[in-house]
Amino acid sequence: MLFQSCGLLSALGRIGSRSPVTRGILARAAVVWARDVDGNWGAPTVSRLVTGHLHKCVRPPWTVPLAGRLYCTLPAAPSSHYRLIYTCKVCATRSSKTISKVAYHKGVVIVRCPGCENHHIIADNLGWFSDLEGRRNIEEILAAKGEQVQRLVGDDAVEILLRNAGESATQDGDKTGEAESAGNKLLS
């Protein structure tokens, strides 16, 4: 018996079957489709129970072409960091850094380019740099120049927070870990 709910396929029956199983892309799925000795696809078997909030599922291979297979995951907890990917205009080096959301929205973020070793201001919510003319982050700085920033959801990044900003962020449940404590040490 198959029950379909929000794209998630679950199966009842044949639990604990010893038939050969082809897992393919279903390494963490609760439901796997079994092939018999002749290579024909059989009914689904439940290989193991998936605990936690992450799961993957697909429809049986014969119902949907490979390009249109259904994948689903439950929503994960929101990340407390951004992944910044940028190209330095001085040396044209492309690099990526991990920065905390709290520092980006409430503090100062400065990253160092691995190519030319220059420091680049990514966010200044504390008003430390007067030449930014009131702009607070890289999105506003580049928007003033007519350029766009693509948001995609660390390394060699300096993140500075006010004590109030870090404390309110942890009260809101947005924990930044070492970046927050490093930022608080810099302000001491």
Swiss-Prot record:
Chief subcellular location: mitochondrion
Signal peptide: none
InterPro entries cross-referenced by the UniProt entry: Mt_import_TIM15, Znf_DNL-typ
Zinc finger boundaries on the chain: DNL-type: 77-174
Pfam families linked to this entry: zf-DNL (PF05180)
GO cellular component, one term: mitochondrion
Binding positions for Zn(2+) per the UniProt entry: C88, C91, C113, C116
GO biological process, one term: protein import into mitochondrial matrix
Places the protein is found: Mitochondrion
Superkingdom in the source lineage: Eukaryota
Gene Ontology terms, MF aspect: protein-folding chaperone binding; zinc ion binding
Keyword Mitochondrion among UniProt keywords: yes
UniProt keyword list: Chaperone, Metal-binding, Mitochondrion, Transit peptide, Zinc, Zinc-finger
The organelle targeting sequence, given as a residue range: 1-68
Residue numbers spanned by region Disordered: 169-188
Role summary: May function as a co-chaperone towards HSPA9/mortalin which, by itself, is prone to self-aggregation.
Name by which UniProt lists this protein: DNL-type zinc finger protein
Species in which this protein is naturally found: Xenopus laevis
